[in-house]
Amino acid sequence: MKAVILCGGLGTRFSEETKFKPKPMIKIGKFPILFHIMKIYEKHGINEFILALGYKGNVVRNFFNKENLIKLNNSYYKYIGKKKEPLKWNIQFCFSGLKTMTGGRLLRLKKYLKKEENFLLTYGDGLANVDINKLIKFHIKQKKIGTVTAVIPSARFGAIKLNGYNVSKFSEKPQSGEGWINGGFFIFKNEIFDF
């Protein structure tokens, strides 16, 4: 099964970072967000990716074409740390437009997904603790065209419980209780393109 990662947004809220690179290329530690997302999928046996490029898409391509990445038969091997463990990913790059919205980006990938009964999709700027294999099993069992992950968001701030004028408890960013939000990881049947 292939995983589509949308990497084309402008990232206006991170303008100091995204002036020179797309949001998926903002680093967390030594590697960009995009790399961490791909590692989530890899952990669950997914190593075929379609990267839907847009704004500053050349930065994404260049990351995978650096000296420390070797291209062999459309697969990329990256040696990390002292173990030098190869990461074998098959990556297709697709330019999906500079200002194209999410649905339009997905539609432009139709020809790359025509042989896939189901495919995974996520945004290139969000990380989550998602069990991809459970998501796939749930999707197949439900027999629906699409499955979206839903999460209860954390509150923006930590909470303090007061007992009179004394602090009795600190709660660091508890769940907000404001309802479910889009967790950013999806799986679709190919039939999605019939709508």
What is the meaning of each model-derived region?
Residues 1-62, 93:
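N-terminal glycine-rich phosphate-binding loop and ensuing alpha1 helix
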Residues 13, 63, 130, 170, ...:
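Residues that scaffold the ATP/ADP-binding catalytic core of kinase and kinase-like folds
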Residues 162-178:
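Short, flexible, basic/aromatic active-site loop/helix in glycosyltransferases
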Residues 55, 122, 162, 187-188:
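A conserved hydrophobic position in a structured secondary element of the catalytic/binding core
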Residues 183-194:
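Conserved nucleotide-sugar donor-binding
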Residues 60-163:
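Conserved beta-loop-beta/alpha segment of the NTase-like Rossmann-fold superfamily
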Residues 9, 55, 133, 190-191:
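Alpha-helix/helix-capping structural signal
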